[in-house]
Amino acid sequence: MQEQVTILHTNDLHSHFENWPRVQRYLLSERTQRQQAGSTVLTVGLGDAVDRAHPLSEATEGQANVDLLNAIGYDAVTIGNNEGLGLTHAALDKLYLHANFDVILDNLTNTADGQPPKWARPAKIITTARGTRILLLAFTAPFTLTYPLNGWTPASVKTRLPELLAQYAGQYDVLVILSHLGINVDRWLAKHFPQIDVIIGSHTYHLLVNGELKNGVLI
């Protein structure tokens, strides 16, 4: 029996609050319509929602952005370099304290103790009404020279993904990667990891209207 799953996604909003009413209206309307048509709907964010170039984000250290994200009911989000590098370590540690969504991140650890951030989880498995297990993993662009200045140590997706595939083997039916890595890395992943089903990309602002199928992986 076939099952339809719809993934709504946002990325690189960069605190463009003037567009938020339209974004929110679209996401909520689209989710309702597709659910009524029988589709399982996931909503995810790909990072760079926060940008301190906007005075409201600057004044609230991104809390105003999280308040808006909360109104959507995201299933999961990851971070971009604007959250990871634009905010101090302390501000990022507090950013998602009142979030009503899960933050997923697999390639950033605290430099001080080597532990992953407390505000993020390495994965999320969502089981649909028909029992399909969807595994969400997430990676952000690993700026190796600048993240350590903020007290974070980034890792390469090329190292982390094989470890995660081994860790979650047999626990999922569909693998979705939330990527703030850029299209070139997304294409590399599709070429080398056919185990991936879908890569939802961001960071480099490429619009793939109908997606791009590489090695059986939908980007």
For the regions a language model picked out, list residue spans one by one.
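Acidic, metal/ion-coordinating pockets
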Residues: 1-219
